[in-house]
Amino acid sequence: MIIGIPKEIKNNEYRVGLMPKHVNELSKKNEVLVQSSAGTGSSFTDNDYLNAGAKIVNSIEEIYYNSELIVKVKEPLLKEYNLIQPKQKLFTFFHFAASEELTLAMMKTKSTCIAYETIEDDSGKLPLLTPMSEVAG
């Protein structure tokens, strides 16, 4: 599988979809593409990702056009909608309930959208929301 990590383009969003240590694990059985400077806001360099086994690409278009799975932090913005490919999988915080526009746009892409905020563990808890809740207080 080809996994793509684009640089977040939402204002004041400095997080990155995957840290180099996770890329290191994933790159053992997958190809991982990271957009140049995607990790800068989280203090990760392109070299950190290269050393973890990723390939650095220059543009967000390269990420979307070449990846089967996109791993982000925040929902796609309007200028990303046309980059999403049919049958592509997107893994991010979507918050669909807050945006009918986003929901309809993602339906039109015919992609598979997996929202972090809806993933439950066996006990019914939302493990991907817990770290964000702790940070937010």
Language-model-detected regions and their locations in the chain:
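Short, polar loop motifs at secondary-structure junctions
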Residues: G39-T40, K74-P76
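N-terminal phosphate-binding or glycine-rich loops at protein starts, especially the Walker A/P-loop
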Residues: M1-S36
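Short acidic low-complexity segments
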Residues: G53-N66
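Glycine/serine-rich phosphate-binding loop and adjoining beta1-alpha1 elements at the start
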Residues: I2, P76-G137
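Alpha-helical segments flanking ligand/cofactor-binding loops in enzyme cores
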Residues: N24, N47, E61, Y81-N82, ...
